[in-house]
Amino acid sequence: MKRKNIDLSNQNVKKSGDKMSKSAKVVVVTSGKGGVGKTTTSASFATGLALRGFKTVVIDFDIGLRNLDLIMGCERRVVYDFVNIINNEATIHQAMIKDKNCDNLFIIAASQTKDKNALTEDGVGRVISELKKEFDYIVCDSPAGIETGAFMALFYADEALVVTNPEVSSVRDSDRILGILSSKAKRALDGQEKVKEHMVISRYNPERVESGDMLSIDDIKDILRIPVLGVIPESKDVLQASN
């Protein structure tokens, strides 16, 4: 995997146990197209942060279609979910699931309700504010597209990982998401510094690029014009690992 290091030395972020007064960072993992690898990226990114000593929570925003718990291997441990917290039916600590393999990693599963409007701006904001008191990083695993869950996932973001496949349709949809981040995120509405955007290119196959069946890294960079954080090669190992 080719990668560019995300800035983990920012003074606004502390490692777990650091006594200095600093605030958490909210990172959304998003895209305009489904099936590009957002949830796998969310799980891997959150795990990487936790292994580096940052207390990290990853939240599934895909209401009605949750699968972060499956990827994280905790599907049988879900008792309460994100919507339960928002509706005051459970506390954050009742809903959070501690990862069995990493002490600094916690998961909040999405609700299986069919009500796509179950997430509210005030409710999500309240939960994010509470989590900021305890965590170094809050990773928001967004559903695809621009439905309510996706908008809520990006609204409070400080940084964004935009996951795209090297296909024209995927890149075009990612460009639309970048437009929403720059105009509809809370930072944009409040006149603050814009959300810091990074690109993750997934399912990259150099042979198909050479044959003209896929866009090259440079092609994608020319279109989206944001820094490339990492390139994940197309591999059957990813599918096997998730199963």
Label for each model-derived stretch:
Residues 26-91, 137:
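Walker A/P-loop NTP-binding active-site region of P-loop NTPases
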Residues 31, 60, 109-112, 164, ...:
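Flexible glycine-/small-residue-rich
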Residues 61-133, 239-243:
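P-loop/Walker-type NTP enzyme "switch/lid" segment
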Residues 62-64, 203, 235:
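Residues in the short beta-alpha loop(s) of Rossmann-like NAD(P)-binding domains
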